[in-house]
Amino acid sequence: MSEQMPIMRSYLAIKREIPKGTILLFRLGDFYEMFGEDAKISSPICGLCLTRRGDTPMCGFPYYSVNTYLAKFIRCGKSVALAEMVEPTGNGVGRYEVVRIVTPGTAEEENVK
């Protein structure tokens, strides 16, 4: 996916803000998507098919199964940030923010097992 696409610019901006090594789950409609290196790491952990859009690796899963996949990340010692659209901007993309971070240390209190 071209870095020039507005959605990819939003994704990369958030990716730069979160701690290094944290997997970014980016909600697009009814799916959480992972791109680039996060997709390559997530695919085997979660048992997801790694695909590509252009040169960009990607994978994803339905939003309603997020706790199932969070548990898989936590079992592998990975921290995860979930980003969602918090405000439509009228340009078809919207403003995204991290709405939740789950780490191996916080997973139990968030009921992720």
Describe the function of each predicted region.
Residues 1-113:
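Basic, polar low-complexity surface loops/patches
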